[in-house]
Regions:
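Blade-terminus and WD-like Trp-Asp/Gly-His loop motifs, strongest in beta-propeller folds
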Residues: 1, 36-44, 82-90, 131-140, ...
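Multi-bladed beta-propeller domains
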Residues: 16-34, 52, 61-78, 98, ...
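Serine-hydrolase catalytic core recognition
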Residues: 268-446
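Beta-strand-rich domains and repeat architectures in extracellular enzymes and scaffolds
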Residues: 1-14, 36-37
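A generic tandem-repeat structural signature
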Residues: 39-102
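Short, solvent-exposed loop/turn segments at conserved positions within beta-propeller repeat blades
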Residues: 6-11, 52-57, 97-103, 146-151, ...
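Short, low-complexity Ser/Thr-rich regulatory SLiMs
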Residues: 95-96, 192, 343-347
Length: 446
């Protein structure tokens, strides 16, 4: 299992051969490595890394067996998002090499950097990037991100450079996040909010145009997806009121099942191994930073076995068993809108001072993950910490997301005023001692 972690000054790639085993460092760069993706049915790794915080990331290929590596991009432009084709011979990636500004999409033979060619020139200042290759490597699925409420998906023919819009509409805003081709290149899986309030998992047949809504019964956002290499099953994650749930999906029937043996927290980085018999994932809880796990998969697409923890991240000697568990609450704002928030507080005979932490964004979301800062405030300052998700926060539907747009911006500030009123009604909280903390948009709110 390859993991990215930081023992020295910056994050590097490590190899863990057994659950709980020692980590063998694979890379030794002065700069932190960025994204990492493994060659299908091969040994090479493609990864990104910039220099001196320039954010002009380059793409490298690495042989983890001997540590040898090679720069694939030009060393000057900004590059990212490498996606392997199914045979592991090429990558598609985004680059601003053409003019230093536009995010174009390029492809390259992994053995010949000089073969790099642009297959899509960005016509505007929006973000474009490769999502997936077709199984025959003749087409590339490409994401065009315009805003948090507007995104589209195109297919580009590698040889002719012909571009086809397959998801989204320039005249109607909707979220359309491409995920990948099916096993016959007949259709694509994607996430969309076109049909209801939330980001749903869906499938579109490319010939007929028929759309199958897969998770319409789940009234929360799907925020992660992985398709097994044999393309018989998939896994997806759902953001349920800030907490993550993991599901397995039968590709043939579109039936899905929640995985029950996942710790309460945040799940990310889901990915199947090449044999489609194991699902890798990272789990972050209020007591542990992100650690790597694997889920055993059985023959039936919806059957699974043991969850195995591979890493146990160090926390600098902190006693995480003393960390308080965040409690999900809601309170009413000035217009009776229910505002969700997480409360971190110890039991106390006396009312606790309060620190209100306001997230950035504005379309961000406070979630109950690992936070040594919040736990420090609770333990050392004796304070309660409240993290509200005021109107305009992501994760609660597109109507809620848009409630602070334009002249309604100050209504989100009023949500903090309503939180102060709520604090005043709580016997365990001291409304005369309240601090407000935030950065970026949260700083504006402060």
């Amino acid at each position: 299992l390859f993991i990215s972690t930081r023992f020295g000054n910056v994050s590097q790639l490590h190899l863990v051969k057994t659950p709980g085993g020692a980590r063998k460092q694979v890379t030794y760069f002065d700069e932190p490595i960025g994204s990492v993706t493994h060659q299908p049915n091969g040994e090479l790794i493609a990864f990104t890394m910039d220099s001196g915080g320039s954010e002009n990331a380059q793409i490298f290929k690495l042989n983890p067996n001997d540590g040898s590596y090679k720069l694939l991009t030009d060393g000057e432009s900004r590059n990212g998002g490498p996606k392997w084709n199914k045979t592991g011979t090429k990558i598609a990636y985004r680059s601003n090499k053409r003019n230093g500004a536009s995010n174009d999409v390029w492809i390259m033979s992994i053995d010949d950097p000089d073969s790099a060619e642009m297959i899509l020139a960005s016509p505007d200042g929006t973000s474009w990037g490769a999502i997936d290759w077709s199984n025959d490597s003749k087409k590339v699925l490409i994401q065009n991100y315009i805003s948090i409420t507007d995104s589209r998906v195109h297919i580009v023919d590698v040889e002719t450079k012909e571009q086809r819009l397959v998801l989204g509409d320039p005249d109607k805003k909707s979220v359309n996040s491409g995920l990948g081709f099916d096993n016959n290149d007949e259709g694509i899986f994607y996430i969309t909010d076109e049909f209801n309030e939330f980001n749903n998992l869906a499938y579109k047949n490319l010939d007929s145009g028929k759309i199958s809504l897969i998770t319409g019964d789940i009234k929360w956002d799907v925020d992660g997806f992985a398709l097994s290499k044999d393309k018989k099953r998939a896994a997806f994650t759902v953001n349920e009121n800030g907490f993550s749930s993991l599901y397995l999906l039968d590709i043939n029937t579109y039936k899905y099942k929640k995985v029950s043996n996942i710790p309460i927290g945040l799940v990310g980085g889901i990915n199947f191994n090449d044999q489609s018999k194991m699902l890798g994932l990272s789990i972050n809880t209020h007591q542990s930073p992100s650690d790597s796990y694997t889920l055993e998969l059985k023959r039936s697409p919806l059957s699974y076995g043991k969850l195995t923890r591979w890493t146990d991240s160090e926390v600098g000697g902190l006693d995480t068993s003393s960390f308080v568990t965040p409690e999900l609450i809601t309170y009413k704002s000035f217009d009776d809108l229910e505002i969700p928030a997480f409360v971190y507080a110890k039991d106390s005979d006396d009312p606790l001072p309060v620190i209100i932490y306001i997230h950035g964004g504005p379309e961000g979301q406070s979630r109950p993950g690992f936070s040594s800062t919040f736990q420090l405030w609770v333990d050392q300052l004796g304070a309660a910490v409240i993290t509200p998700n005021v109107r305009g926060s992501n994760g609660y539907g597109k109507t809620y997301l848009g409630l602070d747009n334009g002249f309604n911006r100050e209504n989100s500030v009023k949500d903090i005023g309503a939180l102060l009123d709520w604090i005043d009604t709580q016997p365990n909280l001291d409304s005369s001692r309240v601090a407000v903390y935030g950065g970026s948009y949260g700083g504006y709110m402060v």
